[in-house]
């Protein structure tokens, strides 16, 4: 049975994402009944549990449409022993504002929320709970637990956590931006990636020596091969001012020849390349890598002494 660490306690959006990944059969080698969810106190703790052998996988948020990348996840993937992404899922994120049974909005003096959640409901809170003092929480479920234990009057939380703790809902489906979505990934120790599906994502972390044009040259390895680069982001290495590593996502799989060639070129060009995985996305995240089948056939013919007749077009 696969032990999967996630940001707890029970009732977080991460738990909901884990349920979704499990139901879709995306946990390698496991069915829906072969998973044991293991709540931990934070995203870095979930990834450390995999590194330490306390969990087989971790389910962690990596990107949301409001605030962008989840930097604790990126930083934890970039340092320490290597880890690899095997699956992803996306959740529509809308929050519940909950209180203990019997309380109304007029009774709310303190509001528990994790920082990311508070940022996504700021306008609603300003309009409806303007006088409430914010109490920090380490997860959406922890915010609900604070209300259940009497440490806060209200919480910004998930519907799952509201039900888990038996709280009343002041408002449901609360979010300042109606298209708020969060992407979660399933992370484990390095292993052969899931098979190519034709709708895949590949991710790497690049360390590039500081030289004029070095970053442009590295990114050109994607462009010259017709690979759709969907994300490029820098994060400090924490070793000195102005020293950064770069995260890059592209459409395609390591078994796609253009992607494989780009990765080999990056390995030659960069000071270090950390492969974060190739995994299915369900639907293509952008333009697919160009097919190389015709070029492979042409090269094989040339090697066999059977070149294309003069003037004959490949197209």
From Swiss-Prot:
Pathway: Amino-acid biosynthesis; L-phenylalanine biosynthesis; phenylpyruvate from prephenate: step 1/1
Molecular function in Gene Ontology: prephenate dehydratase activity; protein homodimerization activity
Enzyme Commission number(s): 4.2.1.51
Site (Essential for activity): 182
Keywords per UniProt: Amino-acid biosynthesis, Aromatic amino acid biosynthesis, Lyase, Phenylalanine biosynthesis
One Gene Ontology cellular component: cytoplasm
Subunit structure: Homodimer.
Protein name: Prephenate dehydratase
Encoding gene (name): pheA
């Amino acid at each position: 049975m696969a032990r999967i660490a996630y940001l707890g306690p029970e009732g977080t959006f991460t738990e909901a994402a884990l349920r979704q990944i499990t139901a879709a059969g995306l946990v390698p080698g496991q069915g829906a009944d072969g998973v044991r969810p293991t709540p931990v106190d934070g995203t870095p703790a979930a990834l450390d549990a995999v590194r330490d052998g306390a969990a087989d996988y971790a389910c962690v948020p990596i990107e949301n449409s409001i605030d962008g990348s989840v930097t604790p996840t990126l930083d934890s993937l970039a340092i320490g022993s290597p880890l690899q992404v095997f699956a992803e899922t996306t959740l529509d994120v809308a929050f519940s504002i909950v209180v203990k049974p019997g309380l109304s909005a007029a009774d709310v003096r303190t509001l528990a929320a994790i920082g990311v959640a508070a940022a996504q409901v700021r306008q609603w809170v300003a309009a409806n709970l303007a006088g409430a003092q914010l109490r920090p929480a380490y997860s959406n479920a922890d915010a609900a637990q604070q209300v259940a234990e009497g440490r806060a009057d209200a919480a910004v939380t998930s519907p799952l956590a509201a039900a888990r703790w038996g709280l009343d809902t002041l408002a449901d489906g609360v979010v300042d931006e109606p298209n708020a979505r969060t992407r979660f990934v399933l992370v484990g120790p390095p292993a052969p990636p899931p098979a190519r599906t034709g709708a895949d994502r590949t991710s790497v972390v690049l360390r590039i020596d500081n030289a004029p044009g070095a970053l442009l040259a590295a990114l050109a390895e994607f462009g010259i091969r017709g690979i759709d680069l969907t994300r490029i982001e820098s994060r400090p290495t924490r070793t000195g001012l102005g020293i950064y590593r770069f995260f890059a996502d592209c459409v395609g799989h390591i078994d796609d020849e253009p992607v494989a060639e780009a990765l080999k070129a990056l390995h030659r060009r960069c000071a270090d390349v950390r492969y974060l995985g190739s995994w299915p996305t369900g639907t293509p995240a952008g333009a697919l890598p160009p097919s190389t089948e015709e070029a492979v056939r042409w090269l094989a013919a040339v090697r066999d002494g059977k070149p294309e007749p003069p003037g004959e077009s490949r197209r």
